[in-house]
Amino acid sequence: MKVAGFDWDAGNWPKCAKHGVSKSEIEHALLHDPLIAPDPAHSGHEDRYIVIGRNPQGRAMFIGVTFRVVDGRPLIRPIPARYMHAKEVKRYETQRSQTENR
């Protein structure tokens, strides 16, 4: 899906900011070769996805998102976002290399 931008508001931005991440880091991680997987455990009235990406400095990030159409424009709505812990990064890198070697 090609997206037209991001859906930021007072509902989702504070959830991301409380973990010390910036909007620009989140947007970069989502636009530069992220790994995206469905998140059925957190999907209710709308589908949610888990996204693993990297900020401009290469730090791994975990981001929960949903996709919405607002005024006819498809947007990415980040919900929670945080930096990944070292153990999570190691697991992600192992899985990613196994996927790429298939």
Regions found by a protein language model. Give the residues of each.
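Ribonuclease/tRNase effector modules and their secretory precursors
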Residues: 1-102
